[in-house]
Amino acid sequence: MSLLSRQVQPAETYLAKLTSADWATLAKRRVLLKGGKGKYGVMVATPVDAETAWAVLTDYDNFHRFLPTVVESRVIQSEGGRTIVEQLDRRRILLSTVESTVRTENLEIDRQQISFRLLEGNLQHMYGHWRLDAAPEALVGKAAHLLVSQQVHAEADVGPFKSMFYNLFETSLVDTVKAIRAEMERRAAASETVKS
């Protein structure tokens, strides 16, 4: 039994929190990062269809092929819409390379949201969700059909290095969502090439 919520917040409520400046950022294909100190929202707009986007978000076994710091990824357990994923993460921090193994529980809801939480890893806690929502044409333009977003809460016990952790985590969030959008768009382009 999962401890994750199966509730999907209505898109209207979710998107109503965005300002006109936020929509302008998304319309320019920039990454929108909001929040701080361990509580973040990150969002991008993309022209891909929801099916392609969902396929990328749930391609757990292949995260290492397109996520920047993931060097190994595998499904440990899968049952219905619940999947346990283990990833080996490798990144440069200052003058050294740091590796960590992270195990997450992921709960897929209505092909629109993936709620996740950390089961094992080097953080005190991490939980949140990925979402796919239709992009309002009037706000982001005709070129984007879909909004891909992640809400995440994360905390690490790093003592006096907490601000450095937050900076690294924020950079990682932006790099990850850029890589996910790039993979979605690569797959959509490959699919179009096959069709023509």
What does each model-found stretch correspond to?
Residues 2-82:
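Hydrophobic ligand-binding cavity/cleft-lining segments
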Residues 117-171:
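Beta-strand/loop substructures that line and gate deep hydrophobic ligand-binding cavities in soluble
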Residues 33, 64, 74-122, 178-187, ...:
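Glycine-rich portal/gate segments that line the openings of hydrophobic small-molecule binding cavities
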Residues 52-59, 168-181:
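Short, well-ordered alpha-helical segments
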Residues 50, 75-82, 107-113, 131-147:
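A short, structured loop/turn motif at beta-sheet edges
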Residues 46-50, 89-93, 106-110, 122, ...:
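Beta-strand elements of well-folded, non-transmembrane domains
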Residues 128-129, 172-176, 193-196:
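Soluble, non-transmembrane catalytic domains of enzymes that act on hydrophobic metabolites at membranes
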Residues 37-45, 82-84, 113, 125, ...:
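Intrinsic-disorder/low-complexity, polar/charged segments enriched in Ser/Thr/Lys/Arg/Asp/Glu/Gln
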